[in-house]
Amino acid sequence: FISYVNSDTNQISRFANELFNTHIKTDTNDNSYKHILYDNHKINHLDKEIITKIDLAAIVWSATSFRTYLQCKRKFYLQNILKIKEHTLSLKPKAYELGDIIHSILEDYYKDFANDDFSKIEELFNKYKSLNPFLILDLEIWKKKLYDFYLYDKDRLKHRKIIALEKNFECEFEGIKIRGVIDRIDKYEDMYEVIDYKTSSTLSVDTLKNYEKTDDFQLEFYYLAMSEIYKSDKIEAYYYDLNNTVLIKEIALDKKLELLTQKFKELKEISNTEISFSKCEDKSNCTYCAYKTICNRE
């Protein structure tokens, strides 16, 4: 079919017949294609309760998937069990893409740290700007931010050395397998420093007063992996706040490890039982969730 508007103010182009071998009839055939244009498709929301048996203890958990499970069991079920993927038909960058680029720039820069001139970082920014036209302004802003980081970190590394970048790991804790990628590992004398880069302007770090409500165990996963890899307990964990060029120590590490132990024990207790994958109570979690349409939480 050839579709066109035929009304008092619009009609088919006079060049249309020159483009096709057959003569185009201008009488309407609305009935032939109205199901394409005019049908109202009803969205089926997943409102029913989901209860099923799943061996949660057999899953290899990342800090991200575990956080999703703690925040919203329904999202975890859709994303990690049914593996329903978010659509990618968009030219505009996803929220996480800028952070991924900054991570990649820092990884590439420190791979060849012998050349510690800021011009190398500028070259890397130019490379990623050419690949991501929608992020040109954001990357230009971040290039200026990373200059402060470059000066601070250059001085800091006079007294320590980087021993690993983007370190993959898989290990076991309390009978449950965990995996992930550590952004960076430094060594200062006999102390290992595990570092997680953060680009968020709203970085919030758990304290000894509020850690019991946390759902973020990323540095704890890293600490456990480091203990396994380097067979040492001389490990400190830090967030590297790139927005403000400051290292923030995970002061609640020991308490959060105790809490993680408790939560993993709970996982094992309910594994292979009827588990309810309910929607989260805190609807603020739904604001940027890829599954909010399915859950009827738009």
Which residues are covered by each model-predicted region?
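Short acidic (Asp/Glu) and glycine-rich catalytic loops that position anionic groups and cofactors
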Residues: A57-I59, L78-E86, H103-S104, E122-S130, ...
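Conserved helicase core region in the C-terminal RecA-like lobe
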Residues: F1-D8, S65-T68, G180-D186, C295
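C-terminal, charged and often intrinsically disordered regions of DNA end-processing helicases
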Residues: A16-K111, K161-I163, D282-K283, Y291, ...
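A non-catalytic, helix-rich entry segment at domain boundaries
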Residues: L98-N168, E172, I251, E258
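Non-catalytic protein-protein interaction segments used by genome-maintenance enzymes to assemble
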Residues: A164-Y230, F264
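C-terminal accessory regions
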Residues: F1-I24, T28, E269-Y291
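C-terminal, active-site-flanking charged/polar segments
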Residues: Q11-N31, K213-Y230, T245
